[in-house]
């Protein structure tokens, strides 16, 4: 789960890697039962109900065999169940094999029709998943090779949106991130000049259309509309409806619980957050405990005004971040900003200065970096 700075191409493709198999042609759109089972399986995975997803995926395998959408659905399942997937695990081999098998089947389809929209989408997703897998495991050259492969299919996707609404997600992501990412990270401007231009407003509109029209990528459209509005556009009020939808639809998914808490804190709305924070803190997984302790620190600091209690939560989050390699830069920026702000309130200026510098170093978004910089220089 540890995220490092990566070139624009990989950053963009990691967003695509979340794409979910889209069943459109190749015989499955007419199969209403397959569509129903697929939607149920995806919802079960999002809700972290893996036993239910297992049963549904087996039914799809019995019905559709080695259909590439089923293979990618299994990869999607693994990406949630075993995250983070490390190269010394059997899950790494199984995940890699699923994706390689999927690309082989897609190649067979594309050999008959090089413009097949479904096979194009499946192959894009498989390459993006592999790019993420290799980069997360430090296999950067292999990751870049997969990323370059995927980019070719992204370009094709713009011509296929009218045929398959699942393309609203990858094309919307591309339109937005192609312009926004180098804006926030000027270093990469010279790296991406050869990519086709994007349009941030159009990208957001495509994601909104995808949230309504896509059968299988609509959840990712909701997720990235939340992410864009809260973290890039700095408009938490516009992000909140998407965070609320995901939390309510998938109550067992603690990532979405954390997103809702983060959004609410940004709006200074703390009512009802305490039981949600405790839900994170009581998880068996250190990653969710890490998130819960960060949010608990904010609650103790802002609502209870118990500064020592807040510091204790922040320190526990920092400790948990080192366990099982769960530390994430964005959440570290929130953690150390809260810690620095609390130390400043307590009169510990040196500790505040050190914490705020760590927050600035970790921050991935201007909306989170700027307040820490401002407080550091007060």
Sequence positions of predicted segments:
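Solenoid-like repeat scaffolds
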Residues: 25-28, 59-65, 160, 192-197, ...
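TPR/TPR-like (Sel1-like) alpha-helical repeat modules
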Residues: 151, 155, 195-199, 204, ...
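Alpha-helical adaptor scaffolds
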Residues: 221-231, 258-268, 277-282, 288-328
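"A position-specific structural signal for the A-helix of alpha-solenoid helical repeats
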Residues: 39, 73, 80, 122, ...
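TPR alpha-solenoid repeat register
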Residues: 70, 119, 167, 220-221, ...
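Residue signature of alpha-solenoid helical repeat architecture, marking inter-repeat boundaries
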Residues: 31-32, 65, 70-72, 114, ...
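Short coil/linker segments at helix-helix boundaries
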Residues: 34, 44, 48-54, 76-117, ...
């Amino acid at each position: 789960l540890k995220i490092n700075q990566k070139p624009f191409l990989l950053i963009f493709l990691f967003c695509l890697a979340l794409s979910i198999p889209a069943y459109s042609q190749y015989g499955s759109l007419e199969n209403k039962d397959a569509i129903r089972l697929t939607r149920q399986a995806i919802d079960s995975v999002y809700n972290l109900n893996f036993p239910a997803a297992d049963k549904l995926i087996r039914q799809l395998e019995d019905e559709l065999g080695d259909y590439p959408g089923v293979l990618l659905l299994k990869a999607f399942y693994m990406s949630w169940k075993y995250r983070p997937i490390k190269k010394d695990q059997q899950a790494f081999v199984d995940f890699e094999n699923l994706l390689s098998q999927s690309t082989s089947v897609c190649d067979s389809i594309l050999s008959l029709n090089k413009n097949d929209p479904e096979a194009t989408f499946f192959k894009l997703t498989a390459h993006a998943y592999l790019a993420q897998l290799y980069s997360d495991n430090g296999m950067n050259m292999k990751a870049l090779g997969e990323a370059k492969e995927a980019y070719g299919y992204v370009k094709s996707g713009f011509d296929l949106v009218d045929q398959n609404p699942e393309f609203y997600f990858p094309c919307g992501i591309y339109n937005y991130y192609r312009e926004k990412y180098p804006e926030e990270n000027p270093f990469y401007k010279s790296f991406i000049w050869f990519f086709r231009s994007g349009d941030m407003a159009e990208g957001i509109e495509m994601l909104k259309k995808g949230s309504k029209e896509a059968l299988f990528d609509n959840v990712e459209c909701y997720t990235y509309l939340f992410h864009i509005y809260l973290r890039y556009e700095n408009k938490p009020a516009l992000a909140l409806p998407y965070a609320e939808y995901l939390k309510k639809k998938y109550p067992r998914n603690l990532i979405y619980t954390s997103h809702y808490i983060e959004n609410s804190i940004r709006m200074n709305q703390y009512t009802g957050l305490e039981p949600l924070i405790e839900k994170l803190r009581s998880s068996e997984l250190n990653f969710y405990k890490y998130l819960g302790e960060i949010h608990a620190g904010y609650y103790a600091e802002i609502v209870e005004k118990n500064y020592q209690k807040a510091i204790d939560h922040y320190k526990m989050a920092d400790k948990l971040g080192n366990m099982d390699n769960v530390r994430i830069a964005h959440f570290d920026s929130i953690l150390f900003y809260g810690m620095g702000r609390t130390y400043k309130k307590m009169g510990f200026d040196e500790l505040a200065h050190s914490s705020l510098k760590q927050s600035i170093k970790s921050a991935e978004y201007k909306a989170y970096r700027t307040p820490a910089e401002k407080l550091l220089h007060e």
